[in-house]
């Protein structure tokens, strides 16, 4: 009789826009030799799928009707993962402004969140690694509330604005800050990602550089899991 596969250790990472969730989570996964799952990519991919077909992403019924045919796949290698809808590689396309503009509306639909949460759990279970770093907005409270390690990664708003504007050539800190505030305000209607839930450890990177932040996250993992 075949023994059931041991489920991976899960590091769940939440946080506001511009907190460095994606870059820090990928780096931590790489150093730990774990898989990595960017849950936000699924919402972006669904937004792309709706917009690409000329449908209205602001109409919840339209978005819900798109779910059965939404053939989504994502890799879990932190260094080389790609995002596909059907056979089309949309890794870059889902970062386009037209997609970013509709993501919050897509993510506010309860049926979408429920469907994608089920998908995320399937991906986590089949990751094939000893552990997986899962990052997003509601990972510590909804997707993986029982994760062995749960972290809220945050930083002061001014720091988040400056970091994001440095990533986006030609965008002022003020413009980026306004975009971050709007996105956080829209997403906070659905889930509280600004405050750590019970049992969630806060890592504040306001005074830390990138490498120090990754070190801090790994230190939490080592303390909680003894890896």
From Swiss-Prot:
Gene3D superfamilies: P-loop containing nucleotide triphosphate hydrolases. Keywords: ATP-binding, Cytoplasm, Kinase, Nucleotide-binding, Transferase. It is found in: Cytoplasm. The keyword Transferase applies. It catalyses: CMP + ATP = CDP + ADP; dCMP + ATP = dCDP + ADP. One of its GO terms (molecular function) is ATP binding. The keyword Manganese does not apply. GO terms for cellular component: cytoplasm. Its EC number is 2.7.4.25. ATP binds at residues 15-23. It holds the Pfam family Cytidylate_kin. SUPFAM superfamilies: P-loop containing nucleoside triphosphate hydrolases (SSF52540). GO terms for biological process: pyrimidine nucleotide metabolic process. This is Cytidylate kinase. It comes from Leifsonia xyli subsp. xyli (strain CTCB07). The lineage of its organism: Bacteria, Bacillati, Actinomycetota, Actinomycetes, Micrococcales. The gene is cmk.
